[in-house]
C-alpha cells in the first residue's frame, strides 16, 4: 500500500470540507424544505387538498432520497474496489465532481410555480449520487 503524503492528506481534507455544504445546505436546511414547499404549492394548484399536497411533496422528496441512497449503496462497493485496484483516483474524482457541479448548477430551474419540478428532483439527486461517488475515490 502506498504511503500518503501530507499534500494528499490535506488535499483530501480540503475536498471533503468543500463538499460538506452541499449536504447541509442542499439536503437538510435550504433546498430540501424549499423543494417541499414548492412541490406542495404545485400539487395544490393541481387540485390536491392542502394536507394531502404537503404529504405528497414530502413523499416525493423522500422517494428521491430513497432511490438515490439505494443507488449509492449498491454502487459504492464496486466503485470502492475499482478505486483501490485502478490506482487512478484523481480522474474519477474529477469526473464525478464535474457531474456533481453540472447537475447542481441546474437546480435554479425550480421556480416558485413548480416549473421543472420533476427534472430538478432528478438533477438534485444525480448531484447527490455524483458527490457520494466522488468520495469513494
Which residue ranges define each predicted feature?
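Membrane-embedded alpha-helical bundles of multi-pass transporters/translocases
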Residues: 2-137
Amino acid at each position: 500500500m502506498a504511503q500518503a503524503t501530507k499534500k494528499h492528506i490535506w488535499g483530501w481534507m480540503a475536498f471533503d470540507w468543500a463538499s460538506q455544504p452541499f449536504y447541509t445546505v442542499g439536503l437538510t436546511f435550504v433546498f430540501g424544505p424549499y423543494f417541499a414547499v414548492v412541490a406542495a404549492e404545485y400539487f395544490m394548484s393541481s387540485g390536491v387538498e392542502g394536507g394531502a399536497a404537503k404529504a405528497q411533496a414530502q413523499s416525493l422528496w423522500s422517494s428521491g432520497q430513497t432511490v438515490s441512497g439505494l443507488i449509492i449503496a449498491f454502487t459504492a462497493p464496486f466503485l470502492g474496489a475499482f478505486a483501490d485496484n485502478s490506482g487512478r483516483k484523481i480522474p474519477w474524482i474529477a469526473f464525478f465532481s464535474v457531474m456533481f457541479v453540472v447537475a447542481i448548477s441546474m437546480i435554479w430551474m425550480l421556480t416558485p410555480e413548480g416549473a421543472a419540478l420533476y427534472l430538478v428532483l432528478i438533477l438534485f439527486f444525480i448531484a447527490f449520487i455524483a458527490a457520494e461517488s466522488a468520495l469513494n475515490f
